[in-house]
């Protein structure tokens, strides 16, 4: 039986790749939503969106960690441009979410100062 990570053209492998891409895209969208909510003064909603984004990223990161662990243990992992794209998508989403946390914090501070 072939492992789902060995054949980069298998449906299972592409399912893993698409899962990483979708989780990254969902997380980035939620992080952007959090920024918009913070601009509207909806900080509880913004925090909720950031928490959801973190959960999406955790799911994708778990898959990434599993891949790296298997590779480190000597398992054959097939790589293709789709997987590279998925990893890039995930890292961009992580960075965007981290920046969104900062933007939400700054927006909270700004609105507090404006309301004094």
UniProtKB/Swiss-Prot annotation:
Record's note on what induces expression: Induced by growth on galactose.
Keywords in alphabetical order: Magnesium, Metal-binding, Phosphoprotein, Phosphotransferase system, Sugar transport, Transferase, Transport
Catalytic center residues: 85
SUPFAM superfamilies the UniProt entry points to: Enzyme IIa from lactose specific PTS, IIa-lac (SSF46973)
GO molecular function, one term: metal ion binding
Residue intervals of the PTS EIIA type-3 domain: 11-109
CC cofactor note: Binds 1 Mg(2+) ion per trimer.
Chain positions found as Phosphohistidine: 85
Cofactor or coenzyme needed: Mg(2+)
Binding positions for Mg(2+) per the UniProt entry: 88
Pfam family, one: PTS_IIA
Domain of life: Bacteria
Gene Ontology biological process: phosphoenolpyruvate-dependent sugar phosphotransferase system
Domain remark from Swiss-Prot or TrEMBL: The PTS EIIA type-3 domain is phosphorylated by phospho-HPr on a histidyl residue. Then, it transfers the phosphoryl group to the PTS EIIB type-3 domain.
Task of the protein: The phosphoenolpyruvate-dependent sugar phosphotransferase system (sugar PTS), a major carbohydrate active transport system, catalyzes the phosphorylation of incoming sugar substrates concomitantly with their translocation across the cell membrane. Involved in galactose transport with PtcB and Lmg_0963.
Subunit composition and interactions: Homotrimer.
Designated name of the protein: PTS system galactose-specific EIIA component
Record organism: Lactococcus lactis subsp. cremoris (strain MG1363)
